[in-house]
Structures are given as C-alpha cells and as structure tokens.
C-alpha cells in the first residue's frame, strides 16, 4: 500500500510517498525561506502563491524519484490543519483533486500528529506509551500518548511557542530570518554563566510554559550591554540555556506524573542539538529512552504526512470531496485509531 503525502501548512512544500512494506520511497521538499527573508517572517499570501507554483511539480518529482506512476498510488494524504488557511487550502485542493482523478481515497491529516509520528519513520521507533514534547514555531505542548489518537494534553505554552521565542530573540540580536537555527549557532560560541536568564514557570507546579517573558528579558539584556560579537553570543547562550532547561524540567515532571519511561520530541525545535543532548542525558539518568526524528524530519515535511496518512487510512479515515481545512485544530479532538 502506497500513500502520497502533501504538506503545505506554512512555508515548506513537502511531498513524499510512503509504502507500508518498503518504507519511504520518495521525499521532495521546497523551502520558502528566501522568499520570506526580506520580510522577517512568513507572509501568508506569498506562501499560498508559492505552494500553487511548487506542489504539482514536486508531486511529479516524487513519482519519478520512486519510479512510480499515478496508478501505483493507493491514497492521497494532505495536511488539513492547523496552519495558514490559504496555504492549507492549496494542499487540500490538490490532494482532493488528485484523489478524485485517480479514484483513490483522500485522507486529511493533522499537522501536529504528523510531527508526533515522525520518529516512527526511523529504524528504532518508540513503543506506546510515551510522553511527547511537541516543540515548534507555533506549538509547545506536552502530550500523554497511549496509542494512535489517544492523546491527552498535559501542558502547553500560554503565550509564545518556544520556536517563536527563538525567532523573535534572534531578530533582537540582529540575525536574519529564520533566526532560531542561527541563534543556536551563535550560542555555541557563547560563554556559559555570563548572563543568567529566568526559567519561566518552573518555580510553581504544573506543566504549562511561558516564553514571552524571555524575549523581553533578552531585549532588556541587549539594551543594557555592549553590542560586540562576544556579548551577543553570550546572550544567545543564556537564552538558549533557559529555554532548554525549562523544556527539560517540564519533561521530567511529565514523565514523573505519567510514570512513562519513554520520551518523544518532535517539531522544528527538536532538531536543536543542545536540547537533544540535555534530554538524552536526563533520560539516561532516569534509565529511560528518548526518541526523535532525523533533523530533516523535524521541520515540516511530506514524509510525516504520508506516514500519518497511512496510519489513518488503515484505521478507516477518509474524506469526501469537499475541501475543508482547520487553521485551528486541537490534537485531542482526533479519534483513536
């Protein structure tokens, strides 16, 4: 069984083909980073138009990469939400149209379920149950996962997501968009301990996050100190350490409250090397396991949508020919498979 996956929720056009016996057969990705760089962030209208230009050519490229034709595809999965409404509509419209033309089922996929299941693409996938840390530019959530669709929200950010805080702080430091990875690179040159940032909401019970205050703290620190390269690197180091420590503390609490021994982290920020190292160290001390996808599957991609589509297709999830997307879509609303 082969599923074509289409991802167009934000500023990456991702197309992939997943085979339930052979695994990933094709993976095509186009990033719009250069398109949005001059604006310092994603411009929704430009994102939608670029998806229109790139989606079909990337589908053709994926079929060629896999050595397949349209008749070899058994279902078409597409991201139905959450995300930018215009961008979502491009992928949903193309996906539904192809499914109709090819007389195969269309499968709407939740973007964050795609991220959550991305580690399943690896050679050593996690078993249920586990705690999932979903950490990206738009989401920071801790989820109890006991099966497909069996998701309980344990905690989430009450304001900025961790990835959003990374990008905003990077902008304060004069770094180009997208700033998160560039901030991490700068932080690697920083001196630990020169500046100490707070660890938000770790001084009280609960599993919620708050990162907007860190951005304000960073802005004040930047204004109060010199603008030389080393000072900026030291501030970047202090900021990254604060975010990573906060995420680690909350993950530890979530594991303690659930009693689970496995931790899965997914989403764009899960590619952060410092975060990976700290969580791996923590899980080793707890005699548990940590799982994450390879870096290219941490950010938005079609492979995770194709895989999640396969899982949902086998569970009997399909859609009619109407084009419906959900820019806001709580993960907990998904049915169990």
UniProtKB/Swiss-Prot annotation:
GO terms for molecular function: iron ion binding; N(6)-L-threonylcarbamoyladenine synthase activity. Its cofactor is Fe(2+). It is found in: Cytoplasm. Keywords: Acyltransferase, Cytoplasm, Iron, Metal-binding, Transferase, tRNA processing. It comes from the Bacteria. Binds 1 Fe(2+) ion per subunit. Fe cation binds at residues 111, 115, 300. Substrate binds at residues 134-138, 167, 180, 272. One of its GO terms (cellular component) is cytoplasm. One of its GO terms (biological process) is tRNA threonylcarbamoyladenosine modification. Belongs to the KAE1 / TsaD family. Required for the formation of a threonylcarbamoyl group on adenosine at position 37 (t(6)A37) in tRNAs that read codons beginning with adenine. Is involved in the transfer of the threonylcarbamoyl moiety of threonylcarbamoyl-AMP (TC-AMP) to the N6 group of A37, together with TsaE and TsaB. TsaD likely plays a direct catalytic role in this reaction. This is tRNA N6-adenosine threonylcarbamoyltransferase. It comes from Salmonella schwarzengrund (strain CVM19633).
